[in-house]
């Protein structure tokens, strides 16, 4: 197979506005029949690229795994054969191993195939994980060579742990409860993991239940947090004990409404009751910035009048929580607002608000450098009546102080292009004084910086090309994006058709997958 790999390195500085340095570009030929790449963030260890090669060996098909270092130089390449009917649904990364999760069929299955790729010797082992019931998988991660699978059996949450070295599967007790929803599964810095569950029953007091387990599934801690009876928790994320405190943050609504009314936050403490802090959207400084000034002011004024009368404001919208970042200065929640565009008579999306392979980190169920993240509610699954497209409205970052209370926020208006699946459109990094949000629009990279004193810097640049004389003939819609990598670094990816006018006519045009390292501050 002919492969074209090009590395282009350039150092530049834009002295005005936000600073954007596009440091290097990786390219590889992308033919029309090729599958898209799944990008796995390995932080300071680089990135991994995984895809179905669309080639077969006997009755099996071939997956390829390509690793790049932080300079985007290829550091390893491996091919592995798997059963022909499986497809990639998730991934995870640890310091020593890369994990790829595959399955055959759709939705609820009784077994999955796990690939364990050794980053040192580039060898791959396969593990067939079977259980006696169909599990609709919503979360996947790995802790100390224990694969943690979570989801729903019928409408009841379930958590399974597969001991990889011993090939033993265990069902974690304490779940399989009706009228409950699994909101989060998160690995902690101290070698434990959290689950976050909320009950949906109107016949009992509503609660958030946080549990912490060791890698083998032994419960170490439980914290039950009461929820205001007129409110419903829609989504929630837990921090991962980078700090001593653990924050739970997400969205809530009033009653049984499906759209969010605002954000909530609470510090977990199993030894004393901690109040949940609720913030309607109009209380945030910049959440409504995607609207016209007139409309935003009207919502803020109306919401203020409701609060003065001890009533809940009426404004609601759809919000997807993406990740919860921990810093010395506190906690930072990335969330994105969106609207739904309903199309009748087309049948339901089987996974409700998200497509069946959606992850806020672009890789189905599973890994981000911060946590596993794939939210999938059985309530939207069973109640979704029509098919919906999505229009992203804005990306917001909320900064919480160490005591768990909202401190300040930043937002960036999103492209309102209609999409068939809900996808993360931007990412961020931060320190105690500023929040940097980056996003991609076709062949442009957009960066906006907000300082805590409310000063704003921003800039838009064309995405780095292999050669200054190259002409981008086409940028594939719906493919590509921006993700935070490590430190103040992002990576940007996409698919382009590029013309090089300096080459012979028959060699001028190439179709490529590209990956760019960006320093934005």
Regions found by a protein language model. Give the residues of each.
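Post-signal peptide N-terminal segment of secreted/secretory-pathway proteins
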Residues: 39-153
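Repeated scaffold domains used in trafficking and secretory/extracellular systems
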Residues: 31-40, 82-93, 129-142, 177-188, ...
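Beta-propeller blade signature
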Residues: 62-70, 112-121, 161-165, 206-219, ...
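A short beta-strand motif characteristic of beta-propeller blades
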Residues: 22-30, 74-80, 123-129, 168-175, ...
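Loop/turn-rich, solvent-exposed surfaces of beta-rich toroidal or solenoidal domains
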Residues: 320-340, 346, 374-399, 419-458, ...
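Conserved blade-ending motifs and adjacent loop-strand segments that build the rim/top face
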Residues: 223-235, 275-318, 408-426, 455-487
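Bacterial Sec-dependent N-terminal signal peptides
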Residues: 1-24
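Short glycine/acidic-enriched loop and turn motifs that connect beta-strands
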Residues: 54-58, 105-109, 154-157, 200-204, ...
């Amino acid at each position: 197979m002919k492969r074209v790999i090009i590395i282009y390195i350039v150092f530049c500085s834009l002295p005005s506005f936000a600073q954007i340095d596009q440091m290097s570009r990786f390219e590889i030929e992308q033919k029309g029949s090729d599958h898209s790449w799944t990008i796995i963030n390995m932080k300071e260890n680089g990135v991994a690229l995984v895809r179905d090669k669309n080639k077969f060996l006997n009755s099996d098909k071939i997956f390829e795994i390509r690793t790049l270092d932080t300079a985007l130089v290829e550091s390893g390449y491996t091919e592995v054969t798997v059963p022909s009917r499986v497809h990639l649904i998730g991934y995870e990364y640890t310091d020593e191993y890369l994990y790829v999760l595959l399955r055959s069929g759709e939705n609820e299955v009784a077994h999955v195939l796990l690939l364990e790729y050794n980053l040192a010797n580039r060898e791959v082992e396969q593990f067939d994980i079977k259980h006696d019931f169909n599990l609709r998988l919503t979360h996947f991660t790995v802790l100390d060579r224990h694969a943690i699978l979570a989801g729903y059996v019928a409408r009841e949450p379930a958590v399974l742990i597969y001991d990889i070295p011993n090939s033993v599967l265990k069902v974690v007790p304490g779940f399989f409860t009706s009228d409950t929803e699994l909101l989060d599964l998160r690995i902690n810095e101290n070698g434990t993991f959290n689950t976050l569950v909320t009950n949906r029953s109107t016949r009992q007091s509503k609660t958030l239940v946080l549990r912490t387990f060791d890698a083998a599934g032994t419960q170490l801690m439980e914290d039950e947090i009461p929820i205001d009876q007129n409110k419903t928790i829609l989504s929630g994320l837990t921090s991962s004990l980078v700090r001593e405190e653990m924050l739970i943050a997400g969205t809530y609504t009033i009653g049984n409404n499906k759209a969010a009314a605002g954000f909530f936050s609470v510090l977990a403490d199993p030894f004393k009751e901690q109040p949940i802090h609720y913030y309607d959207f109009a209380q945030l400084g910049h959440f409504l910035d995607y609207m016209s000034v007139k409309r935003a002011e009207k919502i803020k004024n109306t919401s203020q009048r409701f609060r003065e009368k001890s009533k809940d404001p009426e404004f609601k919208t759809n919000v997807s929580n993406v990740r919860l970042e921990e810093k010395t200065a506190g906690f930072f929640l990335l969330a994105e607002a969106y609207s739904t565009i309903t199309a009748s008579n087309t049948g339901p999306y089987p996974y409700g608000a998200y497509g069946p392979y959606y992850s806020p980190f672009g890789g189905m169920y599973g890994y981000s450098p911060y946590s596993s993240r794939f939210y999938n509610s059985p309530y939207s699954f069973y109640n979704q009546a029509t098919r919906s497209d999505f229009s992203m409205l804005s990306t917001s970052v909320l900064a919480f102080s160490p005591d768990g209370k909202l401190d300040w926020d930043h937002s960036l208006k999103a492209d309102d292009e209609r999409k068939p699946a809900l996808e993360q459109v931007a990412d961020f990094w931060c320190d105690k004084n500023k929040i940097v949000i980056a996003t991609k629009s076709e062949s442009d990279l957009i960066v906006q910086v907000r300082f805590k004193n409310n000063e704003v810097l921003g800039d838009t640049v064309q995405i780095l090309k292999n050669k200054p004389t190259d002409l981008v003939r086409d940028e594939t819609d719906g493919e590509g994006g921006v993700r935070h990598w490590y430190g103040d670094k992002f990576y940007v990816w996409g698919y382009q058709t590029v013309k090089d006018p300096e080459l012979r006519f028959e060699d001028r045009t190439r179709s490529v997958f590209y990956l760019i390292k960006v320093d934005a501050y």
